[in-house]
């Protein structure tokens, strides 16, 4: 086994996880993610299916991208509450955006930063896709993993 040291630009910790942004990589905090998240030993992992802008009947609630982001975030909060986890427990998120544009990315970051007041950003990937399999007109889906 090889050992190595990471010279950290910034390391944030909460009770469950360590969020690391190594020196030599760009600072991702303006984009709402961390390069590395370490889950401390003995923590439970929660795997959340993709959440999107649906109502309780599984119907898409809006065609506007910003409104879909807001409803998706609301649904994520509902799912997290059911599992008794918070945004600070999220260690990885994958965001699928249909018909991706830089404008959509900026809207996502703006809405999410208002909704999530945290300094412990999860590791994150945005995946542009031609369409989503959730509902016709759905433009965003977010799946995530939490550790607590």
Where do the PLM segments sit?
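N-terminal presequence-like segments and the immediate start of the first folded domain
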Residues: 2-74, 78-91, 100-148
